[in-house]
């Protein structure tokens, strides 16, 4: 009887080893494919909202959109857990209209809102305003002259003025004043957390601790503040993203965006005057508005405040706080055309 060498006969161990190696290799390959698919899904989440994506593409272009996507990936750990505050939460809308000139604005706290409210009141009824208000800057929000007269909480009201008397047959012109996100946050912080100390639990009890305020507000923006039935705080009103206001998911392209720059109010007024002049508003009215706006600042302005400069330096010099800032206002930066800060 023919006998084979033992190493040729007993091959079961080698076969098992080969099968195990093949199985392990296959498992690793499929695991890699799985993670690649998850990563693709994660990166595609940046473009998942078609309407938002179309707005971003309009504002940023392809190259800018790619830069924004890379920052998005840095700030989001996974598909199910993203630390960026979402845009377009239906929070609050405050429309002021001047039907005679087919002009409206939606005001956002800390974006020259007191002045824009007064300007729209002036345009709503020029004669009545001139006869009753002699200092536009003193026409402050709590006791404003047009309270309840030309103010609405939805843009749908513009449809009701379609047949009102007007100097022009032009469609409605809608203005949205926006502000650089860090500048706006600092203005709100100094106004509400440093100067205004009489309220209960002011700024979440953080006092002048800006890191504490940012952390507490971020927590609210990622949670309860997104719920429409929740009573929003004064802090929410001043610190919520600008994209949460004015029904922007549906109305973004309807607005002409004007950037507020507190260091150069005159330049902003030049732009605003150009738009208003096109609505048939006389030069005498525009000249009066400019004169009153530039005469002095509102009482809650924080421009040139020494503490504000200190807090700005604190935020800018802290990688942690700058990252937190971008997570809070990522979409404000992108949609309103402000450079996205570099984060570590």
Feature annotation, model-predicted:
Residues 2-344:
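Membrane-interface amphipathic segments in extracytoplasmic regions
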């Amino acid at each position: 009887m023919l006998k084979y060498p033992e190493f040729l006969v007993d091959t079961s161990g080698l076969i098992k080893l080969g099968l195990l190696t093949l199985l392990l290799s296959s498992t690793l390959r499929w695991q890699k494919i799985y993670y690649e698919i998850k990563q693709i899904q994660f990166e595609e989440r940046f473009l998942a909202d078609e309407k938002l994506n179309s707005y971003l593409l309009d504002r940023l272009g392809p190259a800018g959109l790619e830069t924004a996507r890379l920052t998005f990936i840095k700030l989001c750990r996974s598909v199910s857990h993203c630390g960026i505050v979402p845009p377009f939460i239906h929070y609050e809308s405050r429309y002021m209209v001047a039907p005679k000139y087919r002009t409206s604005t939606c005001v956002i706290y800390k974006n020259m809102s007191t002045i824009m409210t007064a300007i729209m009141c002036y345009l709503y009824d020029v004669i009545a305003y001139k006869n009753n208000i002699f200092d536009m800057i003193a026409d402050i929000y709590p006791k404003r002259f047009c309270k309840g007269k030309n103010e609405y909480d939805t843009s749908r009201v513009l449809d009701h003025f379609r047949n009102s008397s007007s100097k022009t047959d032009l469609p409605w012109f809608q203005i949205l004043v926006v502000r650089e996100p860090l500048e706006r946050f600092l203005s709100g912080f100094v106004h509400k957390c440093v100067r205004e100390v009489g309220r209960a639990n002011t700024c979440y009890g953080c006092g002048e601790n800006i890191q504490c305020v940012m952390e507490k507000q971020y927590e609210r923006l990622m949670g309860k503040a997104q719920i429409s039935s929740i009573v929003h705080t004064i802090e929410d009103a001043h610190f919520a993203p600008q994209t949460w206001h004015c029904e922007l998911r549906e109305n973004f392209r309807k607005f002409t965006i004007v950037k507020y720059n507190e260091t150069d109010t005159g330049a902003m007024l030049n732009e605003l005057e150009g738009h208003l002049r096109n609505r048939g508003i006389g030069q005498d009215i525009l000249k009066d508005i400019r004169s009153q706006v530039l005469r002095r600042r509102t009482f809650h302005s924080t421009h040139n405040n020494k503490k504000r400069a200190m807090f700005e330096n604190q935020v800018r010099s802290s990688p942690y706080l700058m990252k937190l800032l971008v997570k809070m206002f990522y979409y404000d930066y992108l949609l309103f055309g402000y450079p996205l800060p570099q984060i570590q």
